[in-house]
């Protein structure tokens, strides 16, 4: 019995890979995830760890993707809401095509276990995360152990 579903996916053609859509079709059934009796996910949290090939400035109204990354995740956000879940800002690594040369992979990789540990240890500030558009290794809302 867990409270958080964390999906780790790349952004493919402005969406998630088809295997995730298949998982949604098989698991998120009426009577389980939504609809009459479909309360098994109610109150749980959905978060994505996502990679995008383009740099962060590409995902702006003036960038070549024309929209923020979060806009491409709206179907997942709405799915979470339909299932009674809370949708958190994604943990994102932009510019994966240049990230290794730019030295951005190591901090992101180090931030990921910090994120997981904070979730496990109940130190992750979900309220703050739900208000943000995107989370990065340098902007994780992690509190002190309490």
Task: Please report, for each region that a protein language model flagged, where it lies by residue.
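Helix-loop-strand module that forms the ligand-binding subsite of alpha/beta enzymes
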Residues: 1-77
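Glycine-rich phosphate/pyrophosphate-binding loop and the adjoining helix
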Residues: 79-146
């Amino acid at each position: 019995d867990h409270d958080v579903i964390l999906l780790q996916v790349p952004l493919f053609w402005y969406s998630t890979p088809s295997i995730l859509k298949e998982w949604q079709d098989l698991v998120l059934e009426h009577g389980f995830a939504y609809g009459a009796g479909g309360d098994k996910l109610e109150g749980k949290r959905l978060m994505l760890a996502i990679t995008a090939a383009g740099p962060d400035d590409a995902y702006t109204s003036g960038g070549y993707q024309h929209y923020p990354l979060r806009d491409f995740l709206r179907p997942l956000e709405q799915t979470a809401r339909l299932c009674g879940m809370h949708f958190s800002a994604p943990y994102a690594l932009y510019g994966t095509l240049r990230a290794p040369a730019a030295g951005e992979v190591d901090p992101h990789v180090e931030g990921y276990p910090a994120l997981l540990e904070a979730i496990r240890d109940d130190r992750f500030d979900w309220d703050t995360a739900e208000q943000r558009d995107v989370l990065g290794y340098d902007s994780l809302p992690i509190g002190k152990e309490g």
